[in-house]
Amino acid sequence: MISGILASPGIAFGKALVLKEEKIVLDTQKITDDQIDAEVARFYEGRNAAVEQLNSIRERALISLGEEKAAIFEGHLMILEDEELEEEILDYLRSNKVNAGVAASKILDQQVTMLSEIDDEYLKERAGDIRDIANRLVKNILGMYIVDLGDIQEESILVAYDLTPSETAQLNLEKVLGVVTDIGGRTSHTSIMARSLELPAIVGTNKVTKLVNTGDYLILDAINNQVYINPTASQIDELKALEAKISEEKAELAKLKDLPAITLDGHKVDVVANIGTIRDCDGAERNGAEGIGLYRTEFLFMDREQLPTEEEQFIAYKQVVEAMNGRLTVIRTMDIGGDKELSYLDLPKEMNPFLGWRAIRIALDRREILNAQLRAVLRASAFGKLAVMFPMIISVEEIRELKAVIETLKAELREEGRLFDNNIQVGVMVETPSAAVNAKFLAKEVDFFSIGTNDLTQYTLAVDRGNEFISHLYNPMHPSVLGLIKQVIDASHAEGKWTGMCGELAGDERATLLLLGMGLDEFSMSAISVPRIKKLIRNVNFQDAKVLADTALQKPTAAEIDQLIEEFLLENSLN
């Protein structure tokens, strides 16, 4: 039994299909001057074949994964057809008198190495994209066979060192039951795409390809993060029972799909979903989300070579708003920086990127980016119920400046004869202690708050949750964090405004009743968590939750708060 990083939840039973990479063997013998033209021709033939394959993969991804995920392969095609890359490879071929395969491998390997050595998790994982492109190009130059994962004929759990984005997009979902890899993280494209496909996946096991052979029977328990290799009969029975239990729970929860999140004593809140692309709207709809509480627009800006145009953004936002069919969609403006970088934006290397030039700070400095995005948002507001919010706000001055920009853009759109919602709601993310402490002033300036507990916790406790030495100190249930949350909620209510939450805490069942009792108006989370949170809210009295919250806010430690919640859940048979 092995474990790794839980990338996409679910349980799968089946035979392993281990993807063994056909090793690329390069002929390093020098070529002669009269062979150079032939090798240049081989390069172009190989590249043309790779481009044709990627175009086919992109079309398949567009159908099965949606426009945003298909854009990954637009990025791959742009790299593959990049004139500077072509020039580098051919210059290396001619000057070093090596064949096309060696030249392409050498130049692309240099790029992979450079990205892998950068101290940035997002860019490190993009090295896998370049590796994918390199393998495809070199194999085509050498005339090697490339496995078509869309042609798998038997039900299988795929086992691989890694699955590239192009391989993941090709998967025959009627036959592929799940995926296990040696490497990868939760933010890798493989993980993101597995979640979009609702395909059980565990990545980053380090050794699964060494321990598993094709034909071995596997249980992929992507609930408890375990992979069983040739399990015993009792293990199979145990996991089958778990699978049946999960199926029963899903069937029961599905009955809540069209029911409101309303307590036993009639207090109504909204349970909504976080999304990153139009594709995610399917999951939101399927799980009964009452709207979109966080549309992460930065995915539109990633995996491409240039900024998305106003028109591209407008189309993307309009699609989501129309898909939600009258339910509120809250768009967060581009939250780039920190752990999310863009190759084309030339962000500075900073000692403390999470405290640096990021999110709204970039937008206020780069007005062309801000204006294009806000114009697109305003135009999309003519097609449904839409609100906009700004990340990383610390002051009243910032929000006043942003509101002035919105009014200027509204005037422009009126002059152009374009339609928009003149009363579009404007809100801010409360994810800095400054915004939380100043909530009573900010509440006078905006229509709503959305609390981002991930960053608020990190900044309040001065804890980098990615630092293994101190990550145990990261706790959104810390009394100081809860005190700030309560302060924000009360400040909004004092001005007749509402407060939502879109951080991980919003989808944490142990925190639900506490947040409910504190007066939170909207819970926004991964779509898959919506039914459970809705069920919990529908099985409790708001007044009881309020007493729980009032008591918890008097406790000096997170442990005491946790104990109080545990006792409440037991007493009310909510465990």
Curated annotation (Swiss-Prot):
List ligand-binding residues for Mg(2+): E431, D455
Cofactor requirement: Mg(2+)
Cysteine pairings via disulfide bonds: none
GO MF annotation list = kinase activity; metal ion binding; phosphoenolpyruvate-protein phosphotransferase activity
Which EC numbers does the record give? 2.7.3.9
Gene Ontology BP term (one): N-acetylglucosamine transport
Could you tell me what reaction this enzyme catalyses? L-histidyl-[protein] + phosphoenolpyruvate = N(pros)-phospho-L-histidyl-[protein] + pyruvate
Give the domain of life. Bacteria
Domain statement = The N-terminal domain contains the HPr binding site, the central domain the pyrophosphate/phosphate carrier histidine, and the C-terminal domain the pyruvate binding site.
Q: What is this protein called?
A: Phosphoenolpyruvate-protein phosphotransferase
Q: Which organism is it from?
A: Haemophilus influenzae (strain ATCC 51907 / DSM 11121 / KW20 / Rd)
| Lineage, broadest ranks | Bacteria, Pseudomonadati, Pseudomonadota, Gammaproteobacteria, Pasteurellales
Gene designation: ptsI
